[in-house]
Amino acid sequence: MKIFLDTADVEEIRQGVAMGVVDGVTTNPSLAAKAGRNFRDVVLEIVEICPGPVSAETVALQADEIVREGRILAKWAPNIVVKVPLMAEGLKAVKQLTSEGIKTNVTLIFSASQALLAAKAGATFVSPFLGRLDDIGQDGMILIRDIVQIFKNYNIQTEVLAASIRHPVHVLQSALAGSHVATMPFKVLQQLVKHPLTDKGIETFLVDWQQVPDAATVFAE
């Protein structure tokens, strides 16, 4: 499963990419506002740091305007993926953008039927939102499994991108459910790395190492 960072914080992306495990980045208008910088400048910096897919979202509500905005975004860098909300006008736009060779990520998906429609329109990625479903008492992982199964049934090439991830369990469950991608906040990526027994083991090894006779010189050059 690929790991994307869901952030517009350039420093977080830099740190994540340096770890060697980040395959892409997703942004949205809310994350852009939180960054507090010119959106174009932020995206151009992100695509320099991360060579993988970088989702940048349109904000128009009519198909022709979504397409216009998508074309502008796609010109910024070859790894830009145009992010479009799931709605009738959005599907029209995705169809057109796909016909022009522009990759798309259909977002704000909360049902398997929505994901199927997005895939039919030609979406490169579909983004079902887990955390927001959990917030209203629904099981987002059932949605992931349903979408993955439908796509397998019909050999649909659209990738399932699990979004609205709140904690490491969401990541693990997404992987078990067959999601192609999980996009997460940087803090969740950090939580995936940490385990108290790992920390304790490192501490013990370092203490024991001091008892090795040549510990102070073995790695000297």
Curated annotation (Swiss-Prot):
Reaction(s) catalysed by this chain's protein: D-sedoheptulose 7-phosphate + D-glyceraldehyde 3-phosphate = D-erythrose 4-phosphate + beta-D-fructose 6-phosphate
Keyword Cell cycle: no
Keywords, comma-separated and alphabetical: Cytoplasm, Pentose shunt, Schiff base, Transferase
Glycoprotein found in the keyword field: no
Stored InterPro entries: Aldolase_TIM, TAL/FSA, Transaldolase_3B, Transaldolase_3B/F6P_aldolase, TSA/FSA_arc/bac
Enzyme Commission (EC) number: 2.2.1.2
Compartment(s) where it occurs, according to its Swiss-Prot or TrEMBL record: Cytoplasm
Gene Ontology BP term (one): pentose-phosphate shunt
PANTHER family associated with the record: TRANSALDOLASE (PTHR10683:SF36)
Reported function: Transaldolase is important for the balance of metabolites in the pentose-phosphate pathway.
Family statement drawn from the similarity comment of this UniProt entry: Belongs to the transaldolase family. Type 3B subfamily.
Protein's name in the database: Probable transaldolase
Organism: Herpetosiphon aurantiacus (strain ATCC 23779 / DSM 785 / 114-95)
